[in-house]
């Protein structure tokens, strides 16, 4: 039950914005079965999975709702029992009917994975009604994306605002994106800045990055530099790449090839295709570092593997 939020960003030159926000998925919920709580990030022996499956099954039959949620995950993943997605859904449905907010939320996630957006929306709505903030966020995402319901930015914005006020920073971030640059939504840079800042102040790296991008759009390079630096420190690859470009192109700072090289290097190691391409260029020409054509080719290959077609073409003609 290792669940994470995925926010997809689209890079256009130096600007990146979130498009089609993704469903928020919780970590494995609480466990009240003393000495028998599983860590889904670990790998256990088959015998241990079978033992735990038996415990969760017995506890679920005794109306331990938290155990039922774990049992559903065991059926879904085939841990200690034959994989049975239908049984997993059945257990989550019954547990959700008992007003367990975690079950309702996980039920929504399963329906979403099955591309049944309508049923996902209903499950998330119930989780939200039971005061599970991640479910509320997911309802907003579905309205934002038009999943299971007609796209409605106004409703999405209302819910994002509510969860943001409860310091759920993905909500602040997605609301900022709506105000920043979403087709069909009136731009409000002042509000976008405020919301990006709130999420960034809590180390939500992509929010720091987008705020930096917004400042860069307005040619406020000093502010952009500080925010790219923070996001890069939080290991956000494109922020490292953009920070390098400011030093490379002398935007708001003195040109500094060594600093640019350092940040392109970090960007590439964090899997920024653009960072790898620039790093290769620096090695090829000996900019900010010792010339090394062999390394230049290696980083171009990585940029190609990361999907940068331009890098693939250069590798083919490399000499």
Tell where the protein language model's regions lie, with residue ranges:
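Short helix-capping/linker turns of helical repeat alpha-solenoids
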Residues: 28, 32-34, 41-44, 61-64, ...
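N-terminal segments that cap or nucleate solenoid repeat domains
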Residues: 20-74
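Classical Sec-dependent N-terminal signal peptides that target proteins to the secretory pathway
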Residues: 1-21
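Hydrophobic face of amphipathic alpha-helices that form TPR/SEL1-like repeat modules
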Residues: 37-45, 55, 70-77, 91, ...
């Amino acid at each position: 039950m290792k669940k994470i939020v995925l926010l997809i960003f689209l890079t256009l030159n130096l600007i990146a914005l979130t498009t089609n926000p993704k469903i928020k998925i919780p970590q494995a919920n609480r466990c009240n079965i003393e000495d028998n709580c599983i860590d889904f990030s670990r790998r256990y022996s088959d015998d241990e999975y079978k033992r735990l499956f038996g415990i969760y099954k017995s506890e679920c039959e005794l109306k331990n709702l938290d155990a039922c949620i774990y049992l559903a995950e065991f059926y879904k993943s085939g841990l200690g029992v034959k994989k049975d997605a239908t049984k997993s859904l059945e257990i989550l449905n019954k547990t959700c009917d008992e007003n367990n907010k975690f079950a309702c939320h996980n039920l929504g996630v399963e329906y979403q994975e099955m591309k049944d957006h309508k049923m996902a929306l209903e499950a998330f709505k119930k989780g939200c009604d039971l005061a599970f903030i991640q479910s509320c966020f997911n309802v907003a995402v579905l309205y934002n994306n038009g999943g299971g319901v007609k796209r409605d930015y106004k409703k999405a914005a209302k819910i994002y605002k509510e969860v943001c006020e409860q310091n759920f920073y993905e909500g602040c971030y997605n609301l900022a994106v709506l105000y920043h640059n979403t087709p069909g939504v009136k731009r409000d840079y002042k509000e976008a800045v405020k919301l990006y800042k709130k999420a960034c102040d809590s180390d939500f790296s992509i929010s720091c990055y987008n705020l930096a991008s917004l400042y860069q759009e307005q040619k406020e390079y000093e502010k952009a530099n500080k925010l790219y630096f923070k996001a890069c420190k939080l290991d956000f690859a494109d922020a490292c790449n953009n920070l390098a470009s400011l030093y490379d192109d002398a935007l708001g700072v003195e040109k500094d090839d060594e600093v640019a090289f350092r940040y392109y290097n970090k960007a590439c190691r964090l899997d920024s295709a653009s960072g790898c391409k620039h790093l290769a260029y620096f090695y090829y020409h000996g900019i900010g570092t010792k010339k090394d054509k062999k390394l230049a080719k290696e980083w171009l290959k990585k940029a190609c593997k990361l999907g940068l077609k331009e890098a693939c073409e250069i590798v083919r003609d490399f000499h």
